[in-house]
Amino acid sequence: SGKYIKLKTLNSKTLSYKDTKVLVGTKYTYKVRARKKAGSGYIYSSYSKAVSTTQKLSKPGLTLKTTKGKQILSWKKVSGASGYYLYQKKGNGSFKQIKKCSSKTTKYTVKTKKGTTYSYKLVPYRVINKKLKNGPASSVKSRKAK
């Protein structure tokens, strides 16, 4: 419903463009057209068919470090995330959410019981129009507690 703006003028040898200023969860629609120098101005082709896309959250990388009596989880910030859900599974149980972290959080320490295997996964989320949208979960990290 918004209007189109010119992002960039590219030379004839450039066949792609990366829009680096997009916001996660926002729909963007793009069109292109060719131009040719004609005297002191340009001749323009018709616009291409519109193509739409919505930027999604990236899959987070999760690191697990085990020390005596605790496990330390750390990750890099996911661009556009409003925060993270941290899930834990003990042994063969099922995953349960153990923490909801802010977007500024990149580390969390969990107390553990020696000999128990713990598994973790991290899910980024973004609040869009007062609704939570989850991104892809990290790979599961598992380790036996010391």
Regions found by a protein language model. Name each.
Residues 27, 81-85:
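Exposed beta-strand and adjacent loop surfaces of beta-rich binding modules
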Residues 19-42, 108-132:
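Beta-strand-rich modules
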